[in-house]
A protein has these predicted regions:
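Core segments of transmembrane alpha-helices
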Residues: 3-8, 51-58, 103-105, 150-155
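N-terminal transmembrane signal-anchor/hairpin module of polytopic inner-membrane proteins
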Residues: 1-20, 170-175
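Membrane-water interface at transmembrane helix exits
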Residues: 14, 18, 42, 91-95, ...
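Interfacial loop-to-transmembrane junctions
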Residues: 135-160
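Alpha-helical transmembrane segments within multi-pass membrane transporters and channels
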Residues: 1, 128-139
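Functional transmembrane core segments of multi-pass inner-membrane proteins
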Residues: 24-131, 171-175
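C-terminal domain-closing interface element
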Residues: 150, 156-175
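Alpha-helical transmembrane segments of multipass membrane proteins
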Residues: 6-10, 61, 83-87, 128-132, ...
């Protein structure tokens, strides 16, 4: 099943973005998100190695796909901080709100996507996680204090932001 989903993700990336440098790096990014989601579902942990691969891909992507500028660099650096630091603060204030892997994943993906798309991906991912949690509570599969694995939800939101980021940002925020 994993292979079928991975193939669909690659097809979607190439279909939406084309068979070029942007499309290929985005497909690699999407496959790494699928690996994070699968690892979180199976083991309850996001491997640091996958997060490091995403961060390295972000640096490679910046030099391949972006016209190098100080503003572009700042946009991506802010992306790493603006989504992960609030998650870290919430996690420190509310025990078990987010796992360390989720926070590191958001830092690396923020570096890859830039701040606007990272925020959009986080909003979508947390919305999906909220709906999923609500369904679990309604059907008495979990309680309000239960821990859920949100990497699959975040991966979906971040993947959507990678493929349709500008459209999503305009629809959500009007930027």
């Amino acid at each position: 099943m994993f292979y079928i989903f991975a193939a669909v993700v690659v097809f979607a990336g190439i279909y939406v973005l084309g068979f070029n440098a942007i499309g290929i790096t985005t497909c690699i990014f999407l496959l790494l998100l699928v690996a994070c989601a699968a690892a979180d579902l199976n083991k309850g942990i996001i491997p640091d190695l996958i997060v490091i691969f995403i961060a390295v891909l972000a640096v490679i992507n910046f030099f391949i796909n972006e016209t190098f500028s100080i503003n572009g660099l700042i946009d991506h650096l802010i992306g790493a901080v603006c989504v992960s630091v609030p998650m870290l603060i919430v996690s420190l204030l509310i025990k078990n709100a987010f796992g360390g892997g989720d926070i590191k994943l958001m830092a690396a993906t923020g570096l890859y996507l830039g701040w606007r798309n990272a925020v959009a991906g986080l909003v979508i991912g947390l919305f999906i996680a909220g709906v999923y949690s609500l369904i679990l509570i309604i059907f008495k599969k979990a309680g309000f204090k239960s821990k859920i694995r949100i990497a699959p939800c975040l991966a979906f939101g971040l993947g959507a932001a990678a493929l349709f980021g500008n459209l999503i940002v305009r629809l959500l925020f009007g930027w």
